[in-house]
Amino acid sequence: MKVYLDNAATTPIASEVIEEIQPYLNNYFGNPSSTHAFGRKTKNAIEINRKKIADLIQAKNNEIIFTSGGTEADNMALRCAVFDLNVKRIITTKIEHHAVLHTAECLRDQENVEIIFLATDHNGNPDLVQLESILNDKVNTLVTLMHANNEISTLLPIKKVASICAKHKHVYFHSDTVQTMGHYTFNLSETPIDFLTCSAHKLHGPKGVGFLYVNQKISLNPLITGCLLYTSDAADDLWC
C-alpha cells in the first residue's frame, strides 16, 4: 500500500469537493458573464462561494478576488502594489516562496524597486526589530512575509507583524497564507492585513483555483486584461 506524506506540497481532492463541483463540469457550464439562464446559474454559484470564503475569514464579499492559484495571487499582490500603490520598496526574507521572491526580483530589475531581506534566525523567524527600524522612514513599502513556511513550517506571528505595519500609513502588508488557509482562523475585521493569498489544492480542493484577499480600502487595476469583466463590485472588476 502506498502512503502519501506530502500534503505540504499538494493534497488530494476531498470527495465532498468533487461532489460539489461535478454539476458545474457536466451541466452548469454557462459563461458567468452571460445574462441567460446558464450564465446566471454559474454567476450565482460564484457569488455564493465568494461569500462563503469571505465569511470564513471575516472579510467582505468584494474583498475576495478569484485567481488561478497562489502564484497568480502573490503576483497580483506584489505587482499591483508597485503599479497601483506606488510602492518603491519590498521587505521580505530569503526563505519566501518563489512566487514572491522571483516576482520581487522581477520588480527590482524591471521597475527599480528596492528589495530588503530581513535577517532570520535558525528557525526561520524574521527579525521584527529590524523590520520596525526600517519602517521608520517614509518610503512606500510592501512587507511580504509568508504565514507558514512550506519547507520548515515556521509560523509567522501574523497579528504582531500586521500591528507593526499598521502603525505606518505608507506601509502595506501581504502574507502568503497558502499553507495555513483552512487550518488557521483568520479574522480580517480585526487584523489589519492588506493582502492574503490562498490556493485550493493545499486544502483538498482542485488545482488551478485560488483567491487573493484585498482590503477594501485599496483600489487595484486588473493585472490581466482582455476579457469581459463584471461590474457589480470591486472584486468582479478584477475577475475574468
Model-derived features with residue positions:
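Pyridoxal 5′-phosphate
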Residues: 1-232
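Single conserved hydrophobic/aromatic residue that forms the stacking wall/gate
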Residues: 230-240
